[in-house]
Amino acid sequence: MTIKDVARLAGVSPSTVSRVIADHPRISPNTKERVRQIMAELGYYPNAIARSLVNQTSNSIGVIRSRLTQGNFANPFFPAVIQGISSVAYKHGLSLVLSTSNSFTHEDEECLNLLRQRRVDGVILLASHRQDQLIPRLAEAGFPFVLIGRYEGSEVINWVNNDNTGDAKKAVSYLLGKGHRRVACLDGDPRYVVSADRLAGYHQALAEHGLEVDPALVEHSEFSVDGGYRATQRLLQNGEFSAIFAVDDLIAIGAMRALQERGVVVGEEVAVVGFNNTILGAYVQPALTSVHVPIYELGQIAVQMLTAQIYGSGTFPDQQMLQAQLVVRGSA
């Protein structure tokens, strides 16, 4: 059974069948449905190698997992965004290639090599860091890519994100509105844009309420429970506070553990607010108040943007800001 047999029975040219196999956006839905039905009836299922030869593509997209999540598969953000990416990639017949790294330099080179060697047709970056060197190189080379996050540089790129600064500001304003005046902040790795943005939201909320930032109440943490635990231990040595804003749920859960070990009643004596509203927050005691970020949707939209860029459809640049909201539970 060959592609010509499918074309003859479907009443189209072999090149049209090839484009249907590639899920080309310029082929009408009716034609795609008719060709796919004939393929199913004939038992014609082109493998990935055959599709690659037809399309001059790899039928794969890369997911670049930076050191933000390196060694941290326990963070629910990562599987949630991958699930969103996978759900749309599957519909396009695309495989995922996951790239990890031990350094920023290795991360950049691995990503570029994936594209240069045509092992992937485009990449999704799960984070950007300060003074990012990879994004300018990707943009200059014309490689298809999408960033989940915010980019500080001048290059015009495709991105999808939530308003981390504005969302953090709302979360801290919520605490200030409940009467807290000594609000501590557990920020993430300062090399990452997401950490800087959420810390900026903390600063803005304090300023709008006429409060100055006390450096003793700001600690940086790894994006992990242990990181939040250790950062809170340092906070407890630095001064008094009645609330903690943590830029990630795992950091917040670590903070709660450190407070509870000291006999502090979380939610009554000290309020704790997290960020991302991952599934773990609903199961700690008390349940965690957190900023809900549509993580799954971030992954879905990133693939939609990337496939549009690869296939030359849609608009460029495509930039979307998703809405987040505060989910109030027992911790604050």
Language-model-derived ranges and their functions:
Residues S60-I64, L68-S173, G177, L235-L236:
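Alpha-helical recognition/docking segments in bacterial nutrient-uptake
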Residues E41-N47, F104-E107, S128, M256:
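Short gly/ser/thr-rich secondary-structure transition/capping motifs
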Residues R26, N30, A48, S52, ...:
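Residues at secondary-structure transition points
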Residues M1-N59, A332:
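N-terminal helix-turn-helix DNA-binding module of bacterial transcription factors
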Residues L9, E41, G84-H92, A139-L147, ...:
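Bacterial carbohydrate/catabolite-sensing allosteric modules
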